[in-house]
Amino acid sequence: MNAAAAPTAKPKSRAESAPASSRERMIEAAISLLRATGLTGAGINQVIAASGAPKGSMYHHFPGGKLELATVALIRWGERVAEGLAAQLAGPAPLPDKVRGIFEGTARTMAHAQYARSCSVGAVSLDLDEETAALAPVCAGIFASWQAVLAAAMHGIPEPRRDALARFVISSIQGAQVQSRAARDNRYLVEAGAIVAALIAQALEESSHARENPAGQPHPRRSRKGD
């Protein structure tokens, strides 16, 4: 997922407007670097340079080093996106339109960033190896949290299909981001959004029809001439 799903920033209080702590600056720098370069470009030196934090503060705030910082940054991004998804899905528009809007918003965000950034969770997932395997369940848990938000919004669709559709939405948007970034063309996201929206509309229609015509219920007998 991308910044398009993040919630709109609220006006900051005086306390919130104070300079961010070195820990917060490192977390935000890590998020930005992970979105741009994955794990390979989000090393300790890169985070320190991007955040402007004192070098000695890294292990003070994150004794586990790069992996601990990456974990915190991923979870922060995951929560941010989940909040944004929930806000977008809570609107009054039909569900297929809202889901298509998520894809289209992500497409606009990627184009605005000149395809230099995508989803930090997706980028890290593609970089995982034996040394960073501890991040695999972190990424999987974040994907699952986004899927849960989507599934909860699919009112009227039975749970097994609802869950499968939610997983498919995440898979589609992640794959479309990879293709869009490679081709520097956001049409992959726009096209995927239209197809996913059509599938959700079909699922809603079929679920509604199934409720109106439960299995085993005889269809009303059509009248014939002479009856």
Identify the residue ranges that each predicted region occupies:
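Amphipathic C-terminal alpha-helical segment
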Residues: T109-H112, L126, E130, I170-Y188, ...
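Helix-turn-helix
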Residues: R25, L33-V72
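N-terminal positioning helix adjacent to the helix-turn-helix/winged-helix DNA-binding module
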Residues: A15, S22-A29, K66, L165
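Generic hydrophobic, amphipathic alpha-helix propensity
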Residues: S22-A30, V47, A73-V81, L150
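N-terminal intrinsically disordered/low-complexity leader segments
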Residues: M1-S21, E206-D227
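Short hydrophobic clusters on alpha-helical segments that form packing/core surfaces
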Residues: M26-L34, T106, I173
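Amphipathic alpha-helical packing segments from all-alpha helical-bundle domains
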Residues: A82, D97-G101, Y115, E130-G156, ...
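Hydrophobic alpha-helical connector segments
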Residues: L85-R117, A166-V169
